Amino acid sequence: MLAHHTSRTPRLCGSRYTGRPDDERVDLINNVFYNWGPTNGGYAGEGGSYNFINNYYKPGPSTATKTSLVHRIFAPNADDGSNSNEAGVWGKFYVAGNVFDNTCPDIQSNATSMKNIESVNTNNWNGIHLNGTPPNGLLTVKSPDPFPTVDISQHNAEMAYEKVLAYAGASYMRDIIDIRITDEAWNGTYTYEGSNGSTNGIIDSQADVEGYIEYKSAPRLRDSDGDGIPDAWETANGLDPYDISDAAEPFAGANGYTAIEVYINSLVEDIMRDGLADAESASTEFFPPMYNPPTPTKTIISRAKAPTLWKITMYS
């Protein structure tokens, strides 16, 4: 998820530093973009192959100030030859299933923006805005088929939006910044402005928002051998809580994953499973088996169906 950024939704480097367009492959799937602009949106991609599939674009108050960005998926341009590519190299793009959201009040008040969003939702290629004139026009950059990549679980764009807001991020628990940003994306709003002239949700310093949060630690669970795995988990899963070496040993039935990897995975396995559920195309996901999986004790915050509510589920 990218939110509240003036540009780069995203900026794709292409093969300009390698000169090998055949080696540049990007799979952009199931991302959420909110409130980009007004400097720019997604652009560049000088050489390479790109899939833009089932992404969810939600233009916000900052996007609304530049109409040309409201319905942009990407603006490809040719390489200028100043690095490793030959001058004139374009990327190739496959776009399908991407959805633009028109519910932000700043967007709904602009008839042109509403019309353009309808246009790109009808035909995603209306969201590819060429920056320059390739030899054969849009055909130069257009691929009729997706480029082959590794198999992953995919949702449609609308479901991806809900999944990202509910489950995305590398945090075991979301902090107040994560919660604020996902809430703003859901409601099409913003909370802060910059201290140096930026407006509409764009900031100029971390001091303009919550700053750097001081995180508090909790007492750690008993770990007699100091291997990073609590005694209770080791005992429940056939390990020796007084043997420091078993944490780095392969865990039974885990395809080579070590015991400590299986333990760490167990902390967020329920989040991962919920995030991957209801996929329209699913790859085989491997979750290492445990003899006695722990009962989650954390607070999981997820979206309720009503757009302005949070549903907080406590597990014990």
Language model: regions and residue ranges:
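Extracellular calcium-associated, cysteine-rich motifs in secreted modular proteins
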Residues: 206-298, 304-306
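Extracellular/surface-exposed low-complexity segments
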Residues: 90, 99, 104, 109-216, ...
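Right-handed parallel beta-helix
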Residues: 1-17, 22-37, 49-61, 94-102
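Short, intrinsically disordered C-terminal tails of secreted or membrane-associated proteins
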Residues: 310-312
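Substrate-binding/catalytic groove segments of enzymes
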Residues: 35-41, 49, 58-71, 101-123, ...
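Glycine-rich beta-solenoid repeat tracts in large extracellular/virion proteins
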Residues: 8-22, 39-46, 63-87, 106-112
